[in-house]
């Protein structure tokens, strides 16, 4: 007879984890889920095992709104090894080509300029994008290359930090769907020497504050402190969470009176004053502006529910 499945806590919010190097995003996610004893958890855009930095982890009802973070812009610091190209475009891969590094400062500046603004990027075979139902990296590991279409991305800012010997350091502020490994690989080809990523750190996601990032070690320390103090771990862990609607913080807010919000929460579009003419909105209710979900302005100017918060008993 199987044991009943243990139910986790109904905890809702977003943890800004400083992902350590060498772990997959999913491994980190599962550790955080266990530490918080959360019944649901999901991350908002994977980081490669080699990469470190900001990985927002959504707990509970916040998972419903993680898509809005996937769509947000991000900022990275990257160090590239020049003169070597690898099959994965990073240091975890096998070197497939070595060439001398002979470009000038002017050639580097000219090459960097071609990656700024609206550009198209062909994703790496070592990515989680899917082709005919399978992830690209699954084909790549079998030595199979499949066709990939170029995708539009925007590089808002590409800052040159330093070039010393065979190392090049850059900072990149980019749109969703941008592969930093691919930018480095393409840059290496444009410079005629090849390149791959040796260090990658995600500095920011959307407008989340950098000083709210926490490490796995810090979470584990808090759990140990709670045990020593004889208090629930949640008492020390939960204050670290950002609000559950923070993934959608870029969207305008529409506040509904309680007389209207009851219909909205039952799945019905409602009319209200002060709403924008179109687009997605964060919806709150009452004088305390309690977040109740995401809505969208329909053709009649009403706020139609798109994703609703399930209200759990206190």
Swiss-Prot record:
One of its GO terms (biological process) is tRNA pseudouridine synthesis. It is an enzyme of class 5 (isomerase). One of its GO terms (molecular function) is tRNA pseudouridine(55) synthase activity. Substrate binds at residues 43, 76, 179, 200. Responsible for synthesis of pseudouridine from uracil-55 in the psi GC loop of transfer RNAs. It comes from the Bacteria. Keywords: Isomerase, tRNA processing. Belongs to the pseudouridine synthase TruB family. Type 1 subfamily. Its EC number is 5.4.99.25. It catalyses: uridine(55) in tRNA = pseudouridine(55) in tRNA. This is tRNA pseudouridine synthase B. It comes from Salmonella typhi. The active site is at 48 (nucleophile). InterPro entries: PsdUridine_synth_cat_dom_sf, PsdUridine_synth_N, PUA-like_sf, PUA_sf, tRNA_psdUridine_synth_TruB, tRNA_sdUridine_synth_fam1_C, TruB_C. Pfam families: TruB-C_2, TruB_C_2, TruB_N.
């Amino acid at each position: 007879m199987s044991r009943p499945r243990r139910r986790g806590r109904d905890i809702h919010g977003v943890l800004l984890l400083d992902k350590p190097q060498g772990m997959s995003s999913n491994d980190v996610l599962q550790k955080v889920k266990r530490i918080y004893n959360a019944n649901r958890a999901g991350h908002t855009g994977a980081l490669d095992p080699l990469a470190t930095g900001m990985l927002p982890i959504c707990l509970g009802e916040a998972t419903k709104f993680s898509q809005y973070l996937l769509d947000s812009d991000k900022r990275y610091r990257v160090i590239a090894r020049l003169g070597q190209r690898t099959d994965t475009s990073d240091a975890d891969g096998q070197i497939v080509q070595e060439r001398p590094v002979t470009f000038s400062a002017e050639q580097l500046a000219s090459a960097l300029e071609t990656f700024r603004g609206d550009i198209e990027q062909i994703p790496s075979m070592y990515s989680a994008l899917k082709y005919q139902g399978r992830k690209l990296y699954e084909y790549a590991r079998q030595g199979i290359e499949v066709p990939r279409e170029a995708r539009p991305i925007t590089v808002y800012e590409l800052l040159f930090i330093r070039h010393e010997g065979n190392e090049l350091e850059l900072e990149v502020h980019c749109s969703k769907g941008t592969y930093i490994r691919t930018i480095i690989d393409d840059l290496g080809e444009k410079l005629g020497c090849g390149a791959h990523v040796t260090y990658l750190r995600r500095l920011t996601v959307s407008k989340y504050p950098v000083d709210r990032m926490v490490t796995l070690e810090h979470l584990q320390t808090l759990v140990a402190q709670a045990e020593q103090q004889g208090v629930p771990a949640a008492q020390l862990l939960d204050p670290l969470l950002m609000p559950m609607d923070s993934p959608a913080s870029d969207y305008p807010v529409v506040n509904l009176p309680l007389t209207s919000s009851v219909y909205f929460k039952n799945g019905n579009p409602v009319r209200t004053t002060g709403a924008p003419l179109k687009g997605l909105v964060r919806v709150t209710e009452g004088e305390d502006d309690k977040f109740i979900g995401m809505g969208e302005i329909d053709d009649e100017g009403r706020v139609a529910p798109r994703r609703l918060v399930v209200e759990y008993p206190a």
